[in-house]
């Protein structure tokens, strides 16, 4: 499967999930379908970070769109719940720190010990980044929690597809366990629902590393706020 096909599966899954939440809250199977979205998007956040030519621009694109959606949501719902784009913004920030550490580890050492200082500084930045994310996730409600933030980071740790798939599988399982145990959740039912996210593992295993026939670079960024707006407007009418 190409990246385009998997991203379209994620988009449809997300849309079905949000339709279920807003318009048909009693139709539980819609939520089950929705469990495919987050892990697939998380995998391709890591892929996007891996291939982007401008990581700062990549971060800002996700963060600013997430911030805009967050402001609208917070004003409308009058509660602080950090949405998935802010989750992925934190993922990109941590991946940038990890990437710096990986680069520092590959630089040959010099008599002045510059490599050691660079590795130490990069490791400190990684620790601070992960610690800050953990503090944020412990202080406010973040979509998919700390494990959700770290899922793309896990995927980004290796360039080898089998290793990336293994890391992705571990990350999806961690997200499953964290989400099923969130305060206020009925653990048994929520665990069964979240377990459907494991279906993304064979889907990612089928990923062929190709972009796909059509380049829809910005479509998925536009689709996220657009489908939420349409669903919200429909909810006002019905």
Functional labels for PLM-detected ranges:
Residues 1-238:
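Alpha-helical transmembrane segments and their immediate juxtamembrane cytosolic regions
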